[in-house]
């Protein structure tokens, strides 16, 4: 389960760090008391929130959509806490993440360069368990998103790190299909299947769990024959 207390949807007001923690604490307590057998990821770009979630409630992962850019203490906090860290690609700041950036020479090279720099810093600080999230829908045009989905596996291979794919209910899906986020299940499942067939989706971040599990089961059943 991925749990967050700071919405990043367009038009949302950014809460303070204290407000974010106040929102999270009741849910974290419920998880710790009733569901702690289920791994929990906390979605935050703030080091103090990450520290609270891990030290006070035992959260298992930190999912940082800012890739350490919003809080210069995040990387050292993650290294000290010793939990897996989801490092997402975001060009610029969180407040401007819905604006499209320009990538030269191309988006996959820019994303690789970004991850090389960030991973090097994390490793120097002692962080070991790093997961890469290419950041679909964040500071990218529709063309960037689809090009990156097609090429990220090959582009990020030199880093030899797990890749998380998060396209569930994203604008890149429902806008193209002229539907809505709530109606994007079919399109999301298609993209999940493509990502799985490419062999680069180690983790899928999803809203519709059953459909994603079915896609995984079908691809895994077919996988032995893909190289024949």
What residues fall within each predicted segment?
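Active-site metal-binding loops of divalent metal-dependent hydrolases
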Residues: 136
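N-terminal glycine-rich anion-binding loops that anchor highly charged ligand groups
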Residues: 1-5
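Active-site-adjacent loop and "lid" segments of alpha/beta metabolic enzymes
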Residues: 8-34, 38-41, 45-48, 55-124, ...
């Amino acid at each position: 389960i991925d749990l967050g207390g700071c919405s990043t949807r367009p038009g949302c007001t950014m809460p303070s760090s204290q407000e974010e923690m106040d929102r999270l604490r009741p849910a974290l307590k419920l998880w710790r008391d009733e569901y702690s057998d289920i791994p929990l990821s906390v979605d935050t770009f703030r080091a103090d929130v990450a520290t609270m979630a891990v030290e006070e409630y035992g959260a298992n992962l930190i999912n940082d959509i800012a890739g350490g850019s919003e809080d210069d203490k995040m990387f050292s906090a993650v290294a000290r806490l010793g939990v897996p860290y989801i490092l997402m690609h975001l060009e610029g700041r969180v407040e401007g993440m819905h604006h499209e950036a320009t990538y030269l020479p191309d988006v996959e090279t820019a994303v690789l360069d970004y991850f090389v720099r960030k991973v090097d810093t994390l490793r120097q600080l002692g962080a070991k368990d790093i997961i890469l999230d290419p950041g679909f829908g964040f500071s990218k045009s529709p063309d960037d998103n689809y090009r990156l989905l097609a090429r990220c596996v090959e582009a990020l291979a030199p880093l030899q790190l797990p890749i998380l794919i998060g396209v569930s209910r994203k604008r890149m899906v429902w806008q193209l299909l002229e539907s809505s986020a709530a109606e994007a299940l079919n399109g999301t499942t298609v993209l999940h299947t493509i990502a799985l067939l490419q062999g680069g989706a180690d983790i899928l971040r999803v809203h519709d769990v059953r459909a994603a599990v079915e896609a995984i089961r079908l691809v895994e059943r077919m996988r032995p024959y893909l190289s024949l």
